[in-house]
C-alpha cells in the first residue's frame, strides 16, 4: 500500500511539475526579430484605442493582407467598394522595430505570437494624441482558439479594447487585381 501511495504522489508531482508556468505580460509582449517575416500575411484581428476604430474596420474593411519585401510593405485592402493597395516604405531601427511614413507616420514593433503569425504593436500620433493598435496577421486565414486566446491576453496586457476579427469566409483581393488597381490610382 505504501508503494502505491508513493507512486501516486510521484505521479502527481511529475504532472504538476510539467505544466508550463502562466505567461506574464513581459513574456506576451516580447519583441520578435524581423528575420522571418518576408512574404504574405493575412489580416486576422486588430485592437486599437483610437476612437471609432472598431466601427471603421467593421463597416469598411472586408479583408486585408500585407506582404513584406524587405524594402517596403504593400497593404492590400478589400473595402465594401473594391480593392486598394497602399505602399509603405519603412526605416528599420533594429531587428524588430521600424517606422513607416506613408500614409501616416507609424512606429511598429513585432511581438511574439504563434509560429506562423505576425503581431505588430503600432503607435502613431493623430490630432495631438498618441494611439496604440495591436494587429494580428497569419499565413493562414483562420487561427485556433488557443492562438486567439494568446492574442486576447496580449490585448489585455496593453489595456486595449476587444479586437475586431476578420471572418474566415471573407475573400481577399487577388494579387493581380490589386496590382491593376494600384496602376490605376
Regions found by a protein language model. Name each.
Residues 1-185:
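A beta-rich soluble binding module of mature secreted/lumenal proteins
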Amino acid at each position: 500500500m505504501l508503494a502505491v501511495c508513493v507512486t501516486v504522489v510521484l505521479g502527481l508531482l511529475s504532472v504538476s511539475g510539467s505544466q508550463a508556468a502562466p505567461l506574464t505580460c513581459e513574456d506576451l509582449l516580447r519583441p520578435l526579430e524581423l528575420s522571418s517575416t518576408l512574404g504574405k500575411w493575412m489580416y486576422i484581428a486588430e485592437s486599437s484605442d483610437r476612437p471609432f476604430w472598431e466601427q471603421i474596420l467593421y463597416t469598411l474593411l472586408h479583408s486585408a493582407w500585407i506582404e513584406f519585401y524587405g524594402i517596403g510593405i504593400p497593404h492590400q485592402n478589400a473595402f465594401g467598394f473594391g480593392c486598394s493597395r497602399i505602399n509603405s516604405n519603412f526605416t528599420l531601427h533594429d531587428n524588430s522595430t521600424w517606422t513607416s511614413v506613408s500614409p501616416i507616420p507609424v512606429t511598429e514593433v513585432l511581438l511574439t505570437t504563434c509560429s506562423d503569425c505576425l503581431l505588430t504593436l503600432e503607435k502613431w500620433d493623430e490630432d495631438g494624441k498618441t494611439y496604440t493598435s495591436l494587429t494580428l496577421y497569419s499565413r493562414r486565414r483562420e487561427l485556433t482558439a488557443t492562438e486567439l486566446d494568446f492574442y486576447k491576453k496580449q490585448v489585455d496586457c496593453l489595456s486595449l479594447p476587444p479586437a475586431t476579427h476578420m471572418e474566415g469566409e471573407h475573400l481577399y483581393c487577388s494579387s493581380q487585381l490589386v496590382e491593376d488597381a494600384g496602376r490605376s490610382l
